[in-house]
Design a protein with these regions (language model features):
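Acidic, His- and aromatic-enriched active-site or binding-groove loops in soluble protein domains
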Residues: 58-74, 187-211
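Short glycine/threonine-rich loop-to-helix capping motif typified by GTGT followed
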Residues: 54, 180-190, 283-290, 337
């Protein structure tokens, strides 16, 4: 039997789990204080829903579940790989939320302000900050089409990060509609814009030449590709310059409002920036998109945007929706690398007792010590020195004994 967790998935030791519990608790506390309510959805979703979710490259990373019994046999006989699976693990929390809202909308307030903190799964190539099983902390607003929804999500998400001591970050904001308008004016066909946007989103990773090469590989019009390359080469891409190529000035006005308002809310505690190349990889985004970046990590530590068409796939009528997700694993990893300590956390000690001790008295003494410490009750080992060394290595700061009033504090403390 293999003892190691599967590649891209992790076992968590008690010290890390304790820290994660605290961080998640502070995030939830911030979300709830702002009027958001938590829900849960199943980890498995219907493959038809997953396939039609416009999830971009994530659709290639779905963990699929094979059909069972006679259904699997029948599927194998078709020779069609797509017939083999009828369900899969969710790759994010947006599709499940959209299905949930469509099924329960008559029982929910409008606008619906919702929290989801849960595990998602992607068949990634594991690397630092990129796992196959990971936690997302999402907040979404469904039923509000105004840019105030974006402003509120940015405000609540940044306050959650600040409340856990995560600082020095930048909120990057863009609007897909402005970018799409500019690209269409350059000669890209409307039905290719999603593909062009996804390539343009890689600007920071592959550079202008890489973007040009990838668009050329997609056999898009040379004149349009060159127009985009010339625009990038011209220097700083300002919002006004991009907006001038967009047919609807109201879209640019909304983006300017969100940028200005978010910057005012930041009050110097973090940065807010217009990022013209920001697209987000998921195809379901329809308007504004945002990401949070920081110097300690090469990718985004949080991201989201508006997805006004997703719920409509289930209902047949459009429901405005926008969400923001904190990449919990990445944020926790950065904080742990910085030596993060839980503020005001009680230190933990052990109360050791011998086999002839009165156990109710042991529990009573442990209770009397818990005003000052977190106390674990353990039987005393035959080799006390070795036992104390193991306890110290496990993070205990000291040991108490039934026959002594004082607490033995370990040397490193």
């Amino acid at each position: 039997m293999k003892t190691q967790a599967l590649k891209g998935m992790r076992d968590l030791l008690p010290a890390e789990q304790t820290l994660r519990d605290y961080i998640q608790g502070k995030i939830l506390e911030t979300y709830r204080a702002s009027g958001f309510e938590r829900i849960s959805t199943p980890m498995l979703e219907d493959m038809e829903n997953l396939d039609k979710s416009d999830g971009g490259d994530n659709l290639n990373l779905i963990f699929k579940v094979l059909k069972r019994g006679d259904k699997l046999t029948a599927a194998l006989n078709t020779g069609d790989p797509k017939q083999l699976s009828d369900m899969g693990l969710r790759y994010d929390l947006t599709l499940p939320l959209s299905r949930y809202y469509a099924a329960n909308k008559d029982k929910l307030p409008s606008p619906f302000k919702v929290i989801q903190t849960d595990r998602v799964f992607r068949a990634e190539r594991p690397q630092k900050g990129r796992l196959r099983e990971f936690v997302q902390c999402d907040i979404d607003i469904l039923g509000d089409s105004s840019p105030n929804a974006e402003v509120e999500l940015i405000d609540v998400t940044t306050r959650a990060l600040l409340n856990i001591g995560f600082t020095g970050f930048t909120v990057n904001i863009n609007d897909r509609r402005i970018l799409r308008g500019m690209l269409e004016s350059m000669g890209f066909a409307a039905d290719t814009l999603d593909s062009v946007c996804i390539t343009f989103d890689k600007m920071d990773k592959i550079g202008a030449e890489g973007v040009k090469a990838e668009l050329t590989e997609k056999q898009l019009p040379e004149a349009a590709i060159q127009a985009l390359a010339d625009f990038i080469a011209a220097g700083e891409v300002t919002l006004d310059a991009v907006a001038a190529r967009c047919a609807d000035p109201a879209i640019a006005d909304d983006l300017k409002y969100v940028l200005a308002t978010a910057n005012a809310m930041a009050a110097g505690r973090y940065q807010v920036a217009y990022c013209p190349s920001l697209v987000r990889g998921q195809g379901y985004y329809t308007g504004m998109v945002f990401e949070i970046t920081c110097p300690q990590f090469s990718g985004a530590v949080a991201g989201g945007g508006r997805y006004d068409n997703m719920v409509g796939k289930f209902l047949g009528t459009q429901v405005p929706a926008v969400g923001f997700s904190i990449g919990f694993e990445r944020v926790c990893g950065i904080l742990m690398e910085q030596g993060y300590q839980i503020p005001g956390a009680k230190q933990k000690i052990v109360l050791l007792y011998t086999k002839d001790a009165d156990f109710p008295a042991v529990l009573a003494k442990a209770a009397s010590l818990r005003d000052s410490y977190n106390v674990t009750v353990l039987p005393q080992g035959k080799k006390l020195g070795k036992q104390l060394g193991q306890l110290e290595a496990a993070g205990f700061v000291g040991a108490a004994f039934m026959d002594k009033d004082e607490i033995k504090i370990f040397a490193q403390q």
